Amino acid sequence: MRLAVGALLWISLNVAAADAPVRFVMADSWAMPMVQLDRGRPTQGILYDIMLSLATQVGVPAEFHVLPRARVQGAMEHGEVDVRCYAAQSWLPNQSGDYIWSIPLFLQRDLLVSRQGPPASIVPASLKHESIGTVLGYVYPTLQPLFDNGQLQREDARNQEQVLDKLLVGRYRYAVTNQWTLDWFNQRLMPGRQLQAVAVLQEQNVGCYVRNDPKVPVQRILRTLLRMKMSGEIDDIIGLYTGAEPRTP
């Protein structure tokens, strides 16, 4: 009898472990096409679709935690969440904890954009006393010396879409965005009103990292991400939202 009870308990524990969700973290400053947040819950977007497909292929439920950007890394360190995507190791110089990184999955391409693109590209250092649309809390290494010496001024918004909305209505002449967001934003505008890239500020490969914990199916997650990248699934999801051919790392 005790053997039977023990066997049932072992089965129950293993079923519970198999059903444990993978907890993904998202920053509340993200906007489309990365993710659409409705009342604090993700409903669509590139990263939402990728995370949902990843969990399905791993065979576990997906659980989404939407947090202020400043709390994201702390949540990883304290074991409140398991997976963070769209990050680079260079963004986390003081990262503490045991993590395993995926291969590069995306190309982060930061652009300086304007309402009317001039005939030639702009050198940011040539700009004087301009307000630049930026996202609150984001760091822009190429522009930081110009912000520090007062040559340029930041004008922060809560997320990338708000930054571009303000540019479109003329709050400032230039803003920083990434290629995904620019492609998404321009899809809703007539050709004559579309925002134009005037400088490439930075290109960087980014991926996901997973908390290295026995309770987390780390290797299954990493293998699945590799398969999704190699099969073209990730690039197909990007193209679905941006309408553009993705730039592969």
Identify the function of each model-found stretch.
Residues D28-W30, F106-L111, Q187-L226, E245-P249:
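Periplasmic-binding protein-like
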Residues P61, V139-L152, R158, L226-P249:
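Ligand-binding clefts/hinges and TM-proximal coupling segments of bilobed small-molecule sensing domains
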Residues P61-P68, L152-K166, A199:
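Short beta-strand-to-loop elements that line the ligand-binding cleft
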Residues G74, Y86-S96, R173-Q202:
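A ligand-binding cleft/hinge motif common to bilobed small-molecule-binding domains
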Residues S114-I132:
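Flexible hinge/capping segments at coil-to-helix
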